């Protein structure tokens, strides 16, 4: 019963805040707010240049492997649990899926910086 009440309150608050943010007028919109900020100086060129898709993909790959490290760091403490076989199986599957993804990226030249 408590979980349902908390869920209802959270949903109501979220919807209320979204509604208020949507209906409030946007005040003080002028060109200076839309411009780029370069340490107080006027920008020398356009700051809205698109960046390379390769850079984006390498960044996403880095984030995935960073997440892998955070998932594998508590593994030595998990080995002290009663079900060591299941822990090893799950960690092996995680590393295997990520290794297969890395091999796929490597064979399709997704990790090369130059085109």
Curated annotation (Swiss-Prot):
Gene3D superfamilies: NADH:ubiquinone/plastoquinone oxidoreductase, chain 3
Gene Ontology MF: a single term: NADH dehydrogenase (ubiquinone) activity
Transmembrane segments: 4-24, 55-75, 84-104
Assigned GO CC terms: mitochondrial inner membrane; NADH dehydrogenase complex
Subcellular location: Mitochondrion inner membrane
Quaternary organization: Core subunit of respiratory chain NADH dehydrogenase (Complex I) which is composed of 45 different subunits. Interacts with TMEM186. Interacts with TMEM242.
Protein name as catalogued: NADH-ubiquinone oxidoreductase chain 3
Organism lineage string: Eukaryota, Metazoa, Chordata, Craniata, Vertebrata
């Amino acid at each position: 019963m408590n979980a349902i009440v908390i869920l209802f309150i959270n949903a109501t608050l979220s919807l209320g805040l979204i509604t208020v943010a949507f209906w409030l007028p946007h005040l003080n919109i002028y060109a200076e707010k839309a411009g780029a900020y370069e340490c107080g100086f006027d920008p020398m060129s356009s700051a809205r240049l698109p960046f390379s898709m390769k850079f984006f993909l390498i960044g996403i790959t880095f984030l995935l492997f960073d997440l892998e490290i955070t998932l594998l760091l508590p593994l030595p403490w998990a080995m002290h649990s009663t079900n060591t076989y299941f822990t090893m199986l799950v960690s092996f599957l995680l590393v295997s899926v990520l290794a297969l993804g890395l091999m796929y990226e490597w064979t399709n030249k997704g990790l090369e910086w130059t085109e």
